[in-house]
Amino acid sequence: MTYHWNWHLFLEQVQSGDETYLQWMVSGLGWTLAVALSAWFIALVLGSLIGTLRTAPKRWLSVPATAWVELFRNIPVLVQLFLRFFVVPELLPPKLSLWVKQDMPSKEFITAALALGLFTSARIAEQVRAGIQSLPRGQSYAALALGFTRTQAYRYVILPMA
């Protein structure tokens, strides 16, 4: 193999401006990290909430949370990205649709962060649900026997151990 890499290509200017290819790559890395961190935050908050709701004894809380997980885990992430970017704006009311379709500077960023965050929230919800259900039932019974409400039992006993 006698191929020699031309690493100086990264220091050359792009044809459309004064930037170099290396500056483009560093900028792309920054946007990638920003999307990843935003999606991580969305996924962690929503996933923890939905995972907790999936273990709630009231069906009006657990059924929508289960539907959320089933919806977002069973649609591939690439399909969700396309749906959020191209289909959802068409389904919104006219004024809101017009606002979403206008040329915003960070429309792609918001769409990607939301789609990845919502997709990953379903996986985190499953992990939280599994963690809660792995605890012995005696833990929640003991909390309720001590006079805790169901919310207090989750907050002070179940979730810290899950």
Q: Where are the regions a protein language model picked out?
A:
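Transmembrane alpha-helices and adjacent helix-loop boundaries
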Residues: M1-A162
